[in-house]
Amino acid sequence: MIQSQTLLNVADNSGARKLMCIRIVGASNQRYAHIGDVIVAVIKEAKPTSALKRSEVIKAVIVRTCKEFKCDDGMIIRYDDNAAVVINKDRNPVGTRIFGAIPLELHQNFDKIVSLAREVI
């Protein structure tokens, strides 16, 4: 579960390395974000040569959480880290590669992210 002020790793090659969640998009009173939710985040750490710079406000989609996630088929998945993928206004990923495992449930809303991922669970 991701809430405000949570630090996340970035699971793509957009240039950002660490994000901090500042808002959950979608509901005004929603406290926690889960896998597949869109968040507003600020870049806390970035590669020096990237187009994305530190303290930029961006949107990202959650792809991995430490909290258990129950799949549609009943399987329970837990990851080692909290991670997100940076997206643009059209909800397409900014990066061209996705690192790490991605759940298949993202296919419903973020088909492009699932197609870029090497590991889909």
Curated annotation (Swiss-Prot):
PROSITE patterns: RIBOSOMAL_L14. It is found in: Plastid, Chloroplast. GO terms for biological process: translation. Keywords: Chloroplast, Plastid, Ribonucleoprotein, Ribosomal protein, RNA-binding, rRNA-binding. It comes from the Eukaryota. The keyword Chloroplast applies. SUPFAM superfamilies: Ribosomal protein L14 (SSF50193). GO terms for molecular function: large ribosomal subunit rRNA binding; structural constituent of ribosome. Its main location: plastid. GO terms for cellular component: chloroplast; cytosolic large ribosomal subunit. NCBIfam families: rplN_bact (TIGR01067). HAMAP family: Ribosomal_uL14 (MF_01367). Part of the 50S ribosomal subunit. Binds to 23S rRNA. Belongs to the universal ribosomal protein uL14 family. This is Large ribosomal subunit protein uL14c.
